Amino acid sequence: AGTAPADLTVAQLESLKEVCEANLACEHMMDVSGIIAAYTAYYGPIPY
């Protein structure tokens, strides 16, 4: 469930990254697994 990465705009992805980068653990997971996986793991479904 949730939003497929291809459905997100660049601006939406950037805003997710900004939220994730405020959390060191999320930022690390983003580097390993990608922004979609990291954001949903720490913050739940993508709100778009």
Swiss-Prot record:
Belongs to the osteocalcin/matrix Gla protein family. One of its GO terms (biological process) is biomineral tissue development. GO terms for cellular component: extracellular region. It comes from Cyprinus carpio (Common carp). The carboxylated form is one of the main organic components of the bone matrix, which constitutes 1-2% of the total bone protein. The carboxylated form binds strongly to apatite and calcium. The lineage of its organism: Eukaryota, Metazoa, Chordata, Craniata, Vertebrata. Gamma-carboxyglutamate residues are formed by vitamin K dependent carboxylation by GGCX. These residues are essential for the binding of calcium. Transmembrane segments: none annotated. InterPro entries: GLA-like_dom_SF (IPR035972), GLA_domain (IPR000294), Osteocalcin (IPR039176). Ca(2+) 2 binds at E18, E21. Residues 1-44 form the Gla domain. Keywords: Biomineralization, Calcium, Disulfide bond, Extracellular matrix, Gamma-carboxyglutamic acid, Hormone, Metal-binding, Secreted. Ca(2+) 3 binds at E21, E27. This is Osteocalcin. Its main location: secreted. PROSITE patterns: GLA_1, GLA_2. It is found in: Secreted; Secreted, Extracellular space, Extracellular matrix. PANTHER family: OSTEOCALCIN.
